[in-house]
Amino acid sequence: MDHALGALTARFRDHLGHERRVSPHTLLAYGRDLDELAAFVTERRGRPATKADLDKLTLRSWLGELARRVSPTSLARKLSSVRAFFAWLEREGLASDNPAALLKSPKLRRKLPKFLSADHAAEVVEAPLSAPGAEAERLRDAAMLEMLYGSGLRVSELVGLDLDHLALEREEVRVLGKGRKERLVPIGSKARAALHTYLARRAELRHPRTGLQDERSLFLGRHGTRLGVRRVQTLVQRYGALGAGRGDLHPHALRHTCATHLLEGGADLRAIQELLGHTSLSTTQRYTHVSLDQLLAVYDRAHPMARKPAARRGRS
């Protein structure tokens, strides 16, 4: 008996949400990818798609059509979604093979993380203190930037923090990372001071009409509800422009900056991996390439053997 694809993808999403407990963002991405595949097959077959329709040739045709309009990174993610779906089908005894596993992932150009200099990072983090706006919001923003840069949090981890996740007396915060894995992250002295100052004014962030406030969330918006990822991204861009002339600054760049500066300061790669919550050390090792690039740039500027022959002749 063949199975309707829509019913199977619905069960898979239920599995991801309730058993795997993936983040809402990840759940949405998986669902969107599988819905796109089902729509592609339905249009080609002229009837609702079934699992039997998903052979290697059909999947290759779908990826070929996608390759004309999405980036290699998006293409790789969509293929990963389908592979995960088939892996689940196999575990449930609903499929005997995984045709998606036979397809090659697109080659991705490895991008080095973008980061700020120490001076620019300090200017961005301090920008809220001299910016216009309500003081409670500015103090909140200063605390958030200290956490993003000082503790290297992902923006999703930052907005997910609750008040009871903080343990300022122990100088640490409990963070819920990817795959809902918990880790303890140290909080530096500047971040602790910024948090203390913000918490003293947090009560001012409540709904202007009802006076209601989310009593659980650490970082609140002006209406007293949990601050969202998009709002934090907008705020980081604002302070990036004010502090360092970087209106394109993304919260993840502050995380990259944290890791890069720790590595430059002599921190152990394994310790940085634990701090950032990376599952694989290879992810953390990207920062060694950044530091090596910096070292080469300094070498080219400073070492006499690195100078071009013409430059050396001109000095003789």
Stretches found by the model and what they are:
Residues 1-316:
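Conserved catalytic core of the tyrosine transesterase superfamily
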